Amino acid sequence: MAIATSTQLARALYDNTAESPQELSFRRGDVLRVLQREGAGGLDGWCLCSLHGQQGIVPANRVKLLPAGPAPKPSLSPASPAQPGSPYPAPDHSNEDQEVYVVPPPARPCPTSGPPAGPCPPSPDLIYKIPRASGTQLAAPRDALEVYDVPPTALRVPSSGPYDCPASFSHPLTRVAPQPPGEDDAPYDVPLTPKPPAELEPDLEWEGGREPGPPIYAAPSNLKRASALLNLYEAPEELLADGEGGGTDEGIYDVPLLGPEAPPSPEPPGALASHDQDTLAQLLARSPPPPHRPRLPSAESLSRRPLPALPVPEAPSPSPVPSPAPGRKGSIQDRPLPPPPPRLPGYGGPKVEGDPEGREMEDDPAGHHNEYEGIPMAEEYDYVHLKGMDKAQGSRPPDQACTGDPELPERGMPAPQEALSPGEPLVVSTGDLQLLYFYAGQCQSHYSALQAAVAALMSSTQANQPPRLFVPHSKRVVVAAHRLVFVGDTLGRLAASAPLRAQVRAAGTALGQALRATVLAVKGAALGYPSSPAIQEMVQCVTELAGQALQFTTLLTSLAP
């Protein structure tokens, strides 16, 4: 090797996990031999160190250089004869002058074979805190592996690593005295002695041929020595899978495998996510399209759906007033008008002569489905039908024309022809007739709901109920009246005939003003309860609102013969 040996030692300040094959793994308190200091050979921030016979780079900020002691004698290189099967060489007794091994004097004359003498076990016990029985196991070659035990805080048993040091440098590092004289010639790397790098090769070869010699710390993948002691620290999984990996010391350091030998994932998370997305896309592409979702019946369909455009008749309109239909633009008018609802017996009269389009629309058997049919307007809010409601509505003249429709209530509307002012009859175009037919039926349902809500509110007021009971009834009144106002506003914008727009806007404006007054009166009655004048004002406003709603509904009914 071209690297010159060094006597500089460094102590590990933190645990380190190797992230590359060139990096060493160590734990806090380990003593490493510095081969090249930081900055030497282009290693900025790294030191080239040796630990347990392994060389690698070490982060310079995780180790601390120890003060250099006096150079030891070169007698450590040729070690004393080693006993066969014993992994720990015994350096010469001339090492007593070194400052690295702070060991009491009785530890030196400890015998190397056979049962130890009396003064030998007490000294190692005070230094390494090992069981007393381990001092008597130096005779057998396999039992010699348990001589170098570490403090109980580390809970580890030494292995065949040539550099077996305690976990903390605060403890004395010398345990070479009890070694038999016949051990291997591989010296410890801990003493401050220059050792030729050529002497490390036979040491590694001698270790490779011996089975019970795994290192204590995590070893790279190139040194695969299976033993139960590998589980004490972080070890690669392929080493733990060997047959000898089931010792009693397994799981002492139960930490995740963070080293470079962690088993790679068969597929990265990003690839898994992309694979799942591709699979989902294929399933969606093969699946049939979802069935058409039917529209739910809702009384608010007029406000939720865009209004269609009025069809422009091919024949000129008989109305003398110019039609502004071609000038109306926008998304609301760009869609065809839905087919009109079925004619009511009372409202269905002979169509305007010369109107072929309306007749074709009625006679067309393949017409589009009317999405506005079957909407139960009067029953949406689940009004409470009180007993006195039928009597109050029975006094009003029933509309004989409405009896043919089972969906419309039998409360009845007044005769529609009575609301028309005397004069020349209004000429309505085909598109306006379709709008009137559609919204006239809607107004009948809205007015029926308004009647039920007004009857419930009047009954609650007569019973002198608190606001928490009559305010919900007033909300239903406001909602039903607001739908009528919306119908008037829509007809005022979409009607092609100017006289028709004027009449509808006038009736809708009066209804909106009555609705605004009713809302203010209900708020005043709720805040001033139990004030009789406030209740009376609310009753008057509700009565006026009901009258305006009746006039508006009658107007639309009369305009759609």
From Swiss-Prot:
Residues 438-488 are annotated as: Divergent helix-loop-helix motif. Residues 103-123, 308-325 have a biased composition (Pro residues). Residues 352-372 have a biased composition (Basic and acidic residues). GO terms for molecular function: protein domain specific binding; SH3 domain binding. Residues 68-123, 171-215, 240-372, 390-422 are annotated as: Disordered. Residues 5-68 form the SH3 domain. A motif (SH3-binding) lies at residues 305-311, 335-341. GO terms for cellular component: cytoplasm; focal adhesion. Changing residue 361 to I: In a colorectal cancer sample; somatic mutation. The modification Phosphotyrosine is found at residue 253. Phosphorylated on multiple tyrosine residues. Phosphorylated on tyrosines by FYN and SRC. It holds the Pfam family CAS_C. GO terms for biological process: cell adhesion; cell migration; cell surface receptor protein tyrosine kinase signaling pathway; intracellular signal transduction. InterPro entries: CAS_C, CAS_fam, EFS_SH3, SH3-like_dom_sf, SH3_domain. Coiled coil: none annotated. Keywords: Cell adhesion, Phosphoprotein, SH3 domain, SH3-binding. CDD domains: FAT-like_EFS_C, SH3_EFS. The protein has been detected in lung and placenta. Belongs to the CAS family. Docking protein which plays a central coordinating role for tyrosine-kinase-based signaling related to cell adhesion. May serve as an activator of SRC and a downstream effector. Interacts with the SH3 domain of FYN and with CRK, SRC, and YES. Contains a central domain (substrate domain) containing multiple potential SH2-binding sites and a C-terminal domain containing a divergent helix-loop-helix (HLH) motif. The SH2-binding sites putatively bind CRK, NCK and ABL SH2 domains. This is Embryonal Fyn-associated substrate.
